[in-house]
Amino acid sequence: KHWSRGLGDVYKRQVEHCRKVNKSFQTQIAVVETILKNNQSILYRSNPCDLQLNKEDINKINFNNYAAVFISGTALSGEPSRNAVLVASKLTSDLKIPLIIDLDYRPYNWESDTIKSDVYKEIMNEMDIIIGNDLEFNVADNSTNGLELAKVYIKKKPSVIVYKMGEEGSKVFTKENESQYGTFNVEAIKPTGAGDAFNGGFISSLYNGLSLEDAAIRGSANAAIVVTRVGCSSAMPNNQELEKFINQNQKEL
C-alpha cells in the first residue's frame, strides 16, 4: 500500500479507506482547446474508477470525525457508487452531520431521465445544503421548471439552496428569504473548475462563520479567478489572492 501512503504524505489526507481497483477501470481524460474564444472541453468517461466506490468503502469511514460531508452528484450517475453514496448520506443524516451536495450533473452513465430525477430527489431529501445550476435543477425535476423545484425543497430539510444561473448570478434560498447575487466580469479562458471553485469559496466561508452573503460573494469571486487561469485545482487562489480580487472588484456586484 505504498501508493496510498504516498498520497497521504503529499496531500495530507487520511488514506486508510483507499484501495486499488481493477486496471480495467480508468481515470478520466480531459481534452481542452487552448484558443481563447469559443473553446471546447471534452471529458471522456469510460469505466471510470471513481464510480467503483462501494458500500464496503463507506463502512471504513468514521463519519463522526468530520464536521460535514460533501457529495458530488457525479458519484450518483452509476453503480456501485450510486448506492454507496445513498448509504453514506443516510448514515451521516442519522448522525446529524451536515450534508452538502453539488448536483454536478454529467450526461454520461445515467440509464434514463426518470432515474436521474428519482435519484436526485431521493438524495436531496437528506441534504442540508444543495448547490446546483439551472440545468441541474431541471434534470433533477425532469422538467424545464427547476427553479420551482428549488423553492419546493427549501420547505423540506435543506436549510440553504444555491441556484446558479451562469452570467446572471445566483439565487440563495433559506427558510426565511431569497437573495440574488451577481457575478464578477472577467475574461474567461475556460469553464473548467468554476463549480469546484464556487463550492470551495462558499462552503469554507460558512465553515469559518461568515454570512451567507459573504459566502456567496466569495464563492463567485473564487470561480471568477479560476476561469481566468489555466488548470483547475492548480488555478485555485489562496485567501490573500481572493481578498485582493474582491476588494478590487466588489463594486461590480
Where does each model-flagged region fall?
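Short beta-strand scaffold segments in enzyme catalytic cores
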Residues: 29-33, 169-172
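Conserved phosphate-binding/catalytic loop of the ribokinase/pfkB sugar-kinase fold
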Residues: 32-83
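A generic structural signal for short hydrophobic patches within well-formed alpha-helices
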Residues: 58, 76, 106, 137-138, ...
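Conserved phosphate-binding/catalytic region of the ribokinase-like
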Residues: 90-91, 146-253
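Single conserved hydrophobic/aromatic residue that forms the stacking wall/gate
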Residues: 1-11
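Hydrophobic beta-strand scaffold residues
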Residues: 15-17, 99-101, 131
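Conserved phosphate/ATP/ADP-binding segment of small-molecule kinases
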Residues: 95, 107-180
